[in-house]
Regions:
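Extracellular/periplasmic, surface-exposed regions of secreted and cell-surface proteins
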Residues: 1-7, 11-17, 21, 25-26, ...
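Acidic-leaning, charged glycine-interspersed low-complexity segments
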Residues: 132-134
Length: 453
């Protein structure tokens, strides 16, 4: 919405209401079992014993888990229901300052997601028909009943505020710049209550029972960044660009949270030079562009190494519900024994890890022939990851201590290679066509360092 000639605002709302209802299939991979049943059951394997729909026919399970598909109905097997709701609100504003080319922009987004999933897996019998006695005999009973209730809530907040500058001086000098701040925060709550076997199959509620299990988790993710970029070009022939990010992640110990990651790139359009346009080479090479770039990017290992570096691993503490033992409630008396939930020490805090850095260097050129109908692109690149977490091999704790050595940003790997692309693009009357050929060759190197003591 254009409020004035200099001020513009916008607002957007997105939402989704989704419900999935399926049979509550048993097993860890229910749909895989159904798919195997479709492809492996042959027509002679009847769904009902003696073709009587009141009695499910017993089919011996195959090696890949194929079963009688007639049992996989909501009335017989139970119901799986998933209710998913989302809403996203976003607002943006733009203000053109009195300084020509300088614009202020802001973006704020709110996202809410809720998931409610219920599972009610029933038991059933499968039969074989005896023609001699005309009896239906139970051949198999599915007894592993299950009832579960899952509730998942997620809230995300994201904001970005930037100053943007774009101006051309004296028709030939193009200057651009961006400076800003952005943040992201996510709060997630997850709760699962389950009962197996089910105490009361006739009521779809989870009653208080010794078979109940409860799983609850809470997670908060927070990141922040300062960003900048500055670019300059002269007649679009000489192009140079500088950029950088100063990122912070909740994953690391205060003091190791921030990392700076710069980048620079440049290009020279040789074919725009007057001496080139006047040369004979321009008759068959219509365009030439030389370019090079170097950039760095940070990785806080939120996904790659989450198992070896869990959330808040830099804090000391204990892990509850880690093992247990049956001990007496009163060792000095005659109290009965009871199971006691165990608590384990988390180990030495991981205080030595910080950002993993990914650096990328690229040198290449673009060439066009026959008025750019034939194009050639070649890139020589090298990508290096440094600071990959690894366990030092020259630090040893006594086995009796029960401690593991802290991981450190020790290792690195490198991928280098050449990318090439040839493209022919032409038009015949109203028909456009193109042919592209891509070729690449890579080389991978790994490097392992020892710890510095």
């Amino acid at each position: 919405m254009q409020l004035t000639d200099k001020f513009k605002v916008g607002f957007q709302t997105l939402g989704k209401i989704e419900q999935n209802v399926n049979p509550a299939l048993p097993g860890g991979d229910d749909y895989f079992q159904m798919r195997n049943s479709i492809f492996n059951l042959i027509p002679t394997m009847r769904p009902y014993a003696n073709d009587n729909p009141d009695y499910l026919n017993y089919i011996t399970p195959t090696h890949d888990g194929a079963r009688n598909m007639a049992a996989y109905t909501i009335d017989n097997a139970g119901k799986h229901q998933k209710d998913f709701r989302t809403i996203q609100l976003s607002a943006n504003l733009e203000y053109k300052t009195p300084l020509p080319g300088l614009t202020a922009k802001g973006l704020l987004s709110y996202y809410y997601e809720t998931l409610h999933q219920t599972d009610n897996e029933k038991s059933w019998n499968e039969y074989r028909y005896d023609p001699a006695t005309q009896e239906y005999k139970v051949a198999s009973t599915k007894t592993d009943t299950y009832r579960g209730d899952v509730r998942n809530h997620k809230v995300e907040m994201m904001g970005q505020f930037t100053l943007n500058y774009d101006h051309i001086f004296a028709k030939d000098h193009h200057v651009t710049a961006v400076a800003g701040f952005e943040f992201f925060k996510e709060d997630r709550k997850y709760l699962t209550v389950a009962q197996s076997p089910v105490e009361n199959p006739f009521v779809e509620n989870i009653t208080t029972n010794a078979n109940n299990t409860v799983s609850n988790s809470v997670r908060t993710i927070t990141t922040a960044s300062f960003i900048f970029r500055a670019g300059y070009s002269y007649k679009e022939k000489y192009i140079i660009d500088f950029a950088g990010r100063y990122d912070a992640s909740w994953r690391f110990l205060p003091g190791n949270q921030w990392g700076f990651f710069p980048s620079v790139s440049g290009a020279w359009r040789l074919s725009e030079e007057e001496f080139y346009k006047d040369s004979k080479v321009a008759d068959w090479i219509s365009s030439i562009k030389l370019r090079a770039s170097y950039g760095e990017m940070g990785d806080d290992m939120a996904r790659n190494f989450n198992s070896s570096y869990p959330d808040f691993a830099y804090l000391p503490g204990y892990a509850f519900n880690n093992g247990g033992a049956i001990i007496s409630n009163n060792p000095l008396g005659n109290a009965p024994d009871a199971y006691t939930t165990g608590t384990a020490y988390k180990g030495i805090p991981q205080t030595g890890l910080s950002w993993m850095k990914i650096s990328m260097m690229n040198v290449g050129f673009d060439m066009g022939f026959l008025n750019d109908r034939l194009k050639l692109e070649v890139d020589f690149f090298k990508r290096k990851r440094s600071g990959i977490p690894a366990t030092p091999t020259d630090i040893i704790y006594p086995y009796e201590a029960g401690y593991s050595v802290q991981k450190q940003n020790l290792n690195s790997d490198q991928v280098s290679g050449i990318d090439g692309m040839v493209r022919w693009n032409d038009r015949v009357n109203d028909f456009n066509y193109f042919v592209t050929r891509v070729r690449d060759k890579d080389c991978v190197k790994n490097r392992v360092k020892r710890a510095k003591i």
